Amino acid sequence: MIQPQTHLNVADNSGARELMCIRIIGASNHRYAHIGDVIVAVIKEAVPNMPLERSEVIRAVIVRTCKELKRDNGMIIRYDDNAAVVIDQEGNPKGTRVFGAIARELRQLNFTKIVSLAPEVL
């Protein structure tokens, strides 16, 4: 469960290393973001000499959460960290690589480009 002020790792090579959630996109009363939700975030830590810089406001999609994800078949998935992938206004990833495993639910939410870049889909 990601809420405003939550710090997240970045799971791509866009240039950001750590994000802080500012807002959850969607209904105005969304309190928490889960896997597949789009958030507005600020970059807290960035790689030097990259296009994205610290204190820049961006959009990102959640790909991993520490909170369990229960599937319809009864399987429960839990990750070790909270991670997101930086996206543009159209929903395409800004980076060219995605690191770590991501959930299969992103494919149903039309983030197919992120799924195709991921090394492992759980």
Curated annotation (Swiss-Prot):
Pfam family, one: Ribosomal_L14
Gene Ontology CC: one annotated term: cytosolic large ribosomal subunit
Molecular function GO terms recorded: large ribosomal subunit rRNA binding; structural constituent of ribosome
Keyword hit for Protein transport: no
Main location: plastid
Function text: Binds to 23S rRNA.
Transmembrane portions of the chain: none
Alphabetically ordered keywords of this record: Chloroplast, Plastid, Ribonucleoprotein, Ribosomal protein, RNA-binding, rRNA-binding
Quaternary structure and interacting proteins, as annotated: Part of the 50S ribosomal subunit.
The family this protein is said to belong to: Belongs to the universal ribosomal protein uL14 family.
InterPro entries, A to Z: Ribosomal_uL14 (IPR000218), Ribosomal_uL14_bac-type (IPR005745), Ribosomal_uL14_CS (IPR019972), Ribosomal_uL14_sf (IPR036853)
Compartment(s) where it occurs, according to its Swiss-Prot or TrEMBL record: Plastid, Chloroplast
Family annotation (NCBIfam families): rplN_bact
GO biological process: translation
Name of the protein described by the UniProt record: Large ribosomal subunit protein uL14c
CDD domains recorded: Ribosomal_uL14 (cd00337)
Cell membrane as UniProt keyword: no
